[in-house]
Each structure stands twice: as C-alpha cells, then as structure tokens.
Amino acid sequence: MELIMNNTVKTTLLAFLLGFSAFASAGHHSGATHEGTQVKHVGFSQMGDPATVLEVKTEASAALRPGDVRVKVLASPINPSDLLQIAGNYGVDPVLPARPGSEGVGRVTEVSADVQALKVGQQVLLASGSAWAEELVAPAAGFLPLP
C-alpha cells in the first residue's frame, strides 16, 4: 500500500495530462467526435505499480452500435480503488488488458438511433468504468443523466 501511495503523484500527473487534452479541446470543437478520429485513453496490460504499468494509448474512435452513446469525458478522478485494482490489491482482478477509471462526468456527443433516454449535449455521470479516457462509447445504461 505504501508503494502505491508514494506513486500517486506520478499517476495523478499521468491522469492530469490525459484529462488536460480533453479539457483543452472542449471549447474548440462544436460537435461530436466522429468515428475514425484518434482518441486517447489510459490502459494497462499487467498489474503492478501504477506509475510503471499505466500507459497512454491512442486508437480510433469506436463506432456506435445499437443502444450505444458516445460521451466526451470532462473529468474523472483517481480513486484509491482504481490504484488498488491496477496494483492487483483490490480483491477483484480486472480482465487484462484493462482501462481504469471507475467514475467521472461527461457530455453526450452522439447517440444511436434507438436511444431515447439521453440526448446530445446532456451531462452524464460515467457509471460504465474505463473513464480515464477522452471519450467513451458504451451502452446508454452505463450513463446516468445529471440535472
């Protein structure tokens, strides 16, 4: 546990840098992130010290499937549970490779045609995990509307 907490500063910096790119672009784009756009996320393929196993990765934005929503991540905290899970000390090990981030807040940028509960522009709580990313594409049930 001490090793994890000593490396929290490095992990915080990594998450801040990823989050900064999302915040920096928030005011400069007026539409949805389109399929094929390159987006960043934090991931890991082995458990261990978060400061050494976490990587910022880039990949093409995922296509929406029926029932899916695309959300631009606005903020995602670093939870102690995230750090413990990355280190393999949480009690439930993730399927590797994994994407950390148990919660966050985002804005809906696109919805599939069959989604009625969420609308473009709506702020949502990210409840589907993998929140250390610039955007998430997941079933609408993984997002809770915010007032």
Give short role names for the model-derived ranges:
Residues 5-26:
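Gram-negative bacterial Sec-dependent N-terminal signal peptides
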Residues 26-35:
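Cleaved targeting-peptide boundary
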Residues 35-42:
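Short structural boundary motif marking the start of a folded domain
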Residues 48-54, 80-81, 117:
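Short N-terminal binding/cap micro-motifs at the start of the first secondary-structure element
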Residues 56-58, 105-107, 135-137, 143:
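Conserved hydrophobic/aromatic beta-strand scaffold that supports enzyme active sites
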Residues 60-77, 89-131:
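Glycine-rich beta-strand-centered segment in the early N-terminal region that forms part
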Residues 81-87:
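Cytochrome P450 core scaffold surrounding the K-helix E-X-X-R motif
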Residues 84, 95, 123-147:
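NAD(P)H dinucleotide-binding glycine-rich loop of Rossmann-like/cofactor-binding domains
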